[in-house]
Amino acid sequence: MASGATVTPRVHSWVMTFVNVGTLGAVPGKRDLLVQILTRRSADLEAAGCLLYEVGINDEQPDTVFVAELWTTVDAHQSSLQLASVQAAIQEARPLLSGEMGGYRFEVIGSPLRD
């Protein structure tokens, strides 16, 4: 691409989904319990507009849980936080969290995997 060229994203129906990718610090030794809560099957999340919710670990960071979420909209994500099932999971997980959190939030504008 020439210097100074402008990139114009192609707009499609799947565009403008909302992504939240984050890390959750777990109390030492409690990571696996936290993962159990986060991976519990939830039809409520899907109904609320969650397209993807992946939970992962990395043995090099034994007290960290990684989460990648894809939502239909930022509003769908925010609304999901008010669901009774989500509030219950948050309350259950809270004692397992160290308070260390990080991550990124962004709206998707394209992908090389789709037209």
Question: Language-model segments: which ranges?
Answer:
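Long, charge-enriched, surface-exposed interaction segments in small proteins/subunits
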Residues: 84-89, 93
